[in-house]
Amino acid sequence: MKHILNLYENINSTARNNSDCPAVILPEEIFFTVSIVGVLENLMVLLAVAKNKSLQSPMYFFICSLAISDMLGSLYKILENVLIMFKNMGYLEPRGSFESTADDVVDSLFILSLLGSICSLSVIAADRYITIFHALQYHRIMTPHRALVILTVLWAGCTGSGITIVTFSHHVPTVIAFTALFPLMLAFILCLYVHMFLLARSHTRRTPSLPKANMRGAVTLTVLLGVFIFCWAPFVLHVLLMTFCPADPYCACYMSLFQVNGVLIMCNAIIDPFIYAFRSPELRVAFKKMVICNCYQ
C-alpha cells in the first residue's frame, strides 16, 4: 500500500512482463466524476439527518457513519488522482518527502474508509438485531447518546488501526491482518444474519406483526452488505495476489484490472445513498424537501 502514486506503473510493468493481459487504463475523468458524485450524495445524507430531528435516531446515526466511510473512499480517490496529476506535470519530486507524506495521508483515508465501512455495517447489523428481537426494550438499550458513544469508540479504533496499518504496510503480516479483517467481520455479520432470520421465522409464527414491522431494516442491511461485498471484494483479492503471487501470469492478469476494481469501490459510495432513499420513506422525504428548497432559493 505504500507509494501509491507509483502503483499504476508497477502494475503496468507486471502485467506486461508476466502475462498477456495489458493493464486496463480508465480515463481520469471517470474517477473524478464518480468520486465527486459519491461525495455529494453522501453529503446529502449527512445534511438530511442533521436538518431533520425526526431522523436523529441511533439507526440514522449509524447510517451516517457508513455515509462518512463512503465519503472518505471518494475523497481518497480525488486526492490520489490530483497527486498523480501533479506528479505527471513535474510538480512533485519522485519519492520526495512531500510525496511520501501525501502518500501516507491518502493511504490512511483509503484504509479508514474500508475499516469504517466494515465496522459501520457491523454496528448496523447489531442495531437491527436489537430492533427486531428486543423491540420493546430498544429505546432503553440503544439511546442516541449511547449510539454516539459507540460511534466515537468505533472511529477512534478505526483511526488508530488505519495509522498502524499504513505505518507497517510494507510488512507481510500487516497485509495479512488487513485482508483478514474483511472476511472476519463479514463472517460476524453473516452469523448474526443467520441467527436473526432463524429467530425471525419462529417469531413470525408466534407474533406475526412484531417482526414484520422491523424486518425492513434487516432487508436494507442485506442489500447494503451485498453491494459492499460486490464492490470491495475484488480489491481485497487484488491486495492478496499482489502480496503473495505478483509474478504469476494469472495473478498478473487479474491485477491488470486494478483501475476497474478502483471504480467499483467508488461506485459503492454512489449506490448506498440510493439504497437509503429507496428503503427509507423518511429519508426520501427529507431528500425531496432539500431539493425543493434549493430549487426555490
From Swiss-Prot:
GO (cellular component) term, any one: cytoplasm
Tissue: Melanocytes and corticoadrenal tissue.
Extracellular-side segments: 1-23, 80-104, 169-180, 245-256
Biological processes annotated in GO: adenylate cyclase-activating G protein-coupled receptor signaling pathway; regulation of metabolic process
Transmembrane segments: 24-49, 59-79, 105-126, 148-168, 181-199, 218-244, 257-278
Residue intervals on the Cytoplasmic side: 50-58, 127-147, 200-217, 279-297
Disulfide cysteine pairs (residue numbers): 21-253, 245-251
Subcellular location: Cell membrane
Record-linked PROSITE patterns: G_PROTEIN_RECEP_F1_1, G_PROTEIN_RECEP_F1_2
Origin superkingdom: Eukaryota
UniProt keyword terms in alphabetical order: Cell membrane, Disulfide bond, G-protein coupled receptor, Glycoprotein, Lipoprotein, Membrane, Palmitate, Receptor, Transducer, Transmembrane, Transmembrane helix, Ubl conjugation
Post-translational modification: Ubiquitinated by MGRN1 that may be involved in post-endocytic trafficking and/or degradation of internalized receptor.
Residues carrying a glycan: 12, 17
Main localization of the protein described in the UniProt heading: membrane
Membrane topology note: Multi-pass membrane protein
Lipid-bearing positions (S-palmitoyl cysteine): 293
GO molecular-function term, one example from the UniProt record: corticotropin receptor activity
Subunit structure: Homodimer. Interacts with corticotropin (ACTH). Interacts with MRAP; this interaction targets MC2R to the plasma membrane. Interacts with MRAP2; competing with MRAP for binding to MC2R and impairing the binding of corticotropin (ACTH).
Protein role: Hormone receptor primarily expressed in adrenal cortex that plays a key role in regulating adrenocortical function. Upon corticotropin (ACTH) binding, facilitates the release of adrenal glucocorticoids, including cortisol and corticosterone. In addition, MC2R is required for fetal and neonatal adrenal gland development. Mechanistically, activates adenylate cyclase (cAMP), the MAPK cascade as well as the cAMP-dependent protein kinase A pathway leading to steroidogenic factor 1/NR5A1-mediated transcriptional activation.
Family designation: Belongs to the G-protein coupled receptor 1 family.
Record-given protein name: Adrenocorticotropic hormone receptor
Species of provenance: Bos taurus (Bovine)
